[in-house]
Amino acid sequence: MVDANCASIKGNKMKSIKVKLSGSSALLMHSDRFANPLDPLTKAHKELTGKRKKTDDDHIAIARSEFIGGCYWNEDTGFFIPAQNLDSCLIAAAKLQKLGVKFKQGVQVLEDELPIDGFKSVTPEKLWENPKNVDARGVKVGMAKIMRYRPIFRNWSLSATVMVNEDVVNLNEVKKALVDAGKLIGLGDYRPRFGRFDVEFA
């Protein structure tokens, strides 16, 4: 579908486009939670990794902690993608049309959090128990290669409202950027191999 249902915002030339994104490749999640040294989960994770001699149980606990720390999740929303991630995805796609600056000025996702459909009642701890939702892969850290554990959603979708200032950019350019973002850019970690999506305009 390519026709957008655009609602005018009274008093200016802002319009909203409601879209549904459906994954065409798996979504690999990796939040920046561990970047906060004051987060209790960060402190607990450092205690686990700080042990000099680690047992198999220690390695499992570290993997689980890393997985949970990589989740974008809260009790109110469930699992979600931050709206700023979709903003960045759209700007990257807009640069293909040489419209990156205009999109920064005139296009923004309305919501703060974009819930992943079907995971509202699932906690990170529960998700960890399903091997289909656990991605384990080797990554390079300096000269060493270590295993990283992240949440993966193999079938996923989410909805968003994209606000457009028509004084800056037109709707057709935004719709093209949305489609390009899904096919060429993607969301989440290891994009565009992961996180690609199809766009449906409501």
Spans of features found by a protein language model:
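RNA-interacting cores
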Residues: 1-202
